[in-house]
Amino acid sequence: MKDGIIQPWLNYDSMLVYSMNFLKRCELLDTPDGPKPAYLVTSKFNEDGTYPEGRNRNNQGGNAYFGMKLFRYYYPYFGDIDALRPVRDLLDRMAYFLTPDDWAWPGMVRTQDNDNPDGIYLDERIETDKAAMAAIAYFDYAEFTGEQKYKALAEHISSLLLACTGEGDAENSPLPFRINMRTGEVEEYYSSDMIFVVELYDKLLGMDTSLDKADIKAKRDLVLKWIKDYPMRNSLWSGYFEDVELALNNVNQFAPMETARYFLNNPSANPELEQDVLDLLAFVKGRFGGTVRFGGTSICEQDVCFIEMSSHTARYASVLARWAALTGNQAAKDEALATFALAEYSAYNKYSKGDVAINSTGLGYPKCWFSDSYFDYLPHYFEGMAAWPEMIPEGSDHIFSTTCMLKDVAYAPGNVKYSAMEPEGTERIKLSFTPKVLSGGKELPKSMWSFGKWRDCEGILTINRKGIKDIEIIKK
């Protein structure tokens, strides 16, 4: 506590590493085709790290999306390539259980394991927002690894989603929420969580693809317009969580916050960016954030599960931190930093040992979920650090912000190396030493980099690459 404001109880680097260690060393559970990491088999486990006899319905599609997002932050920040393994496990497991060729949706991944959770994915139902999230994860994984089979699967998923994208209205989203993949029958018509469809179509428009880009652009614009015309106006932010059935009026915080994040990432998509994000933040805080603890706002999940959870608290903090950086609003920054600190108090619970963190779901929710405790929890801290690097521990060296994927990241005392996957881009690195910046053994022109204070934090190196990919930073 400092001046009545909550502070992190564990430095964020340690929390992130210990949490990733839990995923990398995840216990194997028996399935009908052999032992598999628990995150492929169930979504939930006990606060002491044990697994109940009955498996909980799984949400592998969403976990794959957030797992890949986590890797995109974690790898540049720590240089740990092993953090990719849980993502590969999730993507390969989904790809192993594609739907039969004679189904209405052939060759489709199963993004949930609800019918008989056991690690064997045989569900007939798809949720279209999760399909979009899975496709994004496959595209990003293919980009990083160069393995084109993952891109081909992502394009196939995208083609099926494009085929069912149409006009929406107040009771029908542009893509139905839930569809029976065997029959093609629509089971639920409405989900406000359409922003991942927009993100997927954006990705397709920015790459080489065999799909019709005119069709993609038209449908991308249609979905984005629907979001602005309906949930942005009527606040009917329902339809995301896999374990909630037929609940049109069950509002959640997830969809408005992820929509706000999209607007922050894509300012050209919304001329009213500052006000719209502020309105979404105010809506979520007003409906789900009634509890304030020592300056930090604690966020509940949804109307039918009105419980404070750290993943959603950290999600709110990450969007608020980004908005504060955009606008220069000091009060918003202070609230965001306190909210991040509050959300950390469920990490590394009393059953954790050594360098492995068992993370409870929230302060009053001791059980653990792979989504809420790990995959959809940890990435929000990296977004906070990208906005406000003072969250990064002093005396450490970290690449905390990039505009493209990086490879061959390596850290040594007084030395940082990496290769960017695109010839132009910007990286920001917090350093414990005064740097000299090289590319190909030659000093980088001073016009391409600067070192000093950035957003209230000293020791920040900003590199604006033009026509180069390989960077080495050495102590001056």
Regions found by a protein language model. Give the residues of each.
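Terminal, non-catalytic domain-edge segments
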Residues: 1-33, 89, 203, 207, ...
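Well-ordered alpha-helical segments within folded domains of soluble proteins
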Residues: 1-4, 56-76, 119, 123-143, ...
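Low-complexity, Ser/Thr/Pro/Gly-enriched N-terminal "stalk/linker" regions
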Residues: 1-62, 81-118, 148, 155, ...
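Surface-exposed intrinsically disordered loops and tails
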Residues: 34-56, 101-120, 171-186, 236-246, ...
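Alpha-solenoid helical repeat scaffolds
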Residues: 77, 97, 144, 164, ...
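Solenoidal tandem-repeat scaffolds enriched in leucines and small polar residues
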Residues: 142, 147-230
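Beta-propeller domains
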Residues: 211, 219-236, 249-257, 265
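C-terminal beta-sandwich/jelly-roll accessory domains of carbohydrate-active enzymes
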Residues: 391-476
